[in-house]
Amino acid sequence: MCDMIESQPAQKIGKMKKLRRTLSDSFSRIALKKDENAIDEICVTKMSTRNCQGIDSVIKHLDPIPEDKKVRVQRTQSSFDPFEKTSNQPTSPKFGKADSYEKLEKLGEGSYATVFKGKSKVNGKLVALKVIRLQEEEGTPFTAIREASLLKGLKHANIVLLHDIIHTKETLTLVFEYVHTDLCQYMDKHPGGLNPENVKLFLFQLLRGLSYIHQGHILHRDLKPQNLLISDTGELKLADFGLARAKSVPSHTYSNEVVTLWYRPPDVLLGSTDYSTCLDMWGVGCIFVEMIQGVAAFPGMKDIQDQLERIFLILGTPIEETWPAVHSLPHFEPERFTLYGPKNLRQAWNKLSYVNHAEDLASKLLQCFPKNRLSAQAALNHDYFSDLPPRLWELSDMSSIFTVPNVKLQPEAGESMRVFGKNNSFSKSLSNSKH
């Protein structure tokens, strides 16, 4: 089942501002290093999720921070490096420099970030530039620090690659691989439910990426179709780690204001902050149903109360026998909810019955009681995937599932396969983060 990740104690606002200011300074100083290798090590406070080591002389300017609070986040390696030089190219701008990229059209804008399509001046390859505006008093937004630090340590075919970090006085720019579309756009383009074989491949990739980060004690916390990027070859990649949380990442508290309402689990809706990997697995179940059925599983129209009613109408209103200690949750008031019994999922989403083992898998993901939800690794071993080639379970982290012979997306209803289109998903998945 799911793994628990303990909440961190609340931090005082003053201390958090000081921390953000210090980390902002560290980004700035690293960005100004003359040694191009210096940018490969970003010093952050309590943010690494793997391969933590001591801090060397490259970043001695952070000595005021206690040694036990310092960790290193390694630069992600990938098959595509925007600074990979071809033989006929002259010396180009350094790693971590703004003039290494050309901004193309704007793709999207959020409260604190604007996303541009960009191009590496070294080799002409496309990138996505997430430009985060900095405020003098606040420094680098904490969610930006979190996203950058986590992604720098993640190496997986189903996680969007962070290639570069550029820090100036006014902005922090995260340079991502360019991905053509996202699952939300893909489903909009193919209404009525996706090809069942494609659903299986998308879900398998989603679970691969989640299993990887969960093993590193990282929660994504904002799973939704807009945050699942899809390349022109069909690779699905987890994106927008602005709300992601590592076990060692400090914060004011674990907020329950995470995950778009439709994909938010009932325990979080009821005020629980005792998060585990189960939080993400509820989102997986919602996305799975949506891909098959062609409509959102629980499309609440009003508020949290309405969202919970939609969930309980299908899964049953929780009681102590089905959800131990549910009455202890901050927002659980039994008198507010109609008492429903659980239904077979096919009664609500009939297309689940068309695919072998789909209803069973969905039912094991969409469990109101968090501890009853399947883990990502357990879901990968479900019978629903039994007809896929065994080699898929033997792939290395950085290997795409499409390297396995005969694994490919199938045409959607009424269409032959083609490149998904030019619309880039970063306009939603990156600029709509909490930065």
Curated annotation (Swiss-Prot):
Catalytic function, reaction form: L-seryl-[protein] + ATP = O-phospho-L-seryl-[protein] + ADP + H(+); L-threonyl-[protein] + ATP = O-phospho-L-threonyl-[protein] + ADP + H(+)
User: Which spans does this entry mark as compositional bias, Polar residues?
Assistant: 75-92
InterPro entries listed in its UniProt record = CDK (IPR050108), Kinase-like_dom_sf (IPR011009), Prot_kinase_dom (IPR000719), Protein_kinase_ATP_BS (IPR017441), Ser/Thr_kinase_AS (IPR008271)
Q: Which SUPFAM superfamilies match?
A: Protein kinase-like (PK-like)
Q: What is its main location?
A: membrane
Name of the featured protein: Cyclin-dependent kinase 14
Question: Which residue ranges are recorded for the region named Disordered?
Answer: 75-97
Q: Which residues bind ATP?
A: 107-115, 130
Q: Name one Pfam family in it.
A: Pkinase
**Keyword annotations:** ATP-binding, Cell cycle, Cell division, Cell membrane, Kinase, Membrane, Nucleotide-binding, Serine/threonine-protein kinase, Transferase, Wnt signaling pathway
Q: Which gene encodes it?
A: cdk14
Family from the record:
Belongs to the protein kinase superfamily. CMGC Ser/Thr protein kinase family. CDC2/CDKX subfamily.
The Gene Ontology CC terms held by the record are: cytoplasm; cytoplasmic cyclin-dependent protein kinase holoenzyme complex; cytosol; nucleus; plasma membrane
* Entry membrane topology: Peripheral membrane protein
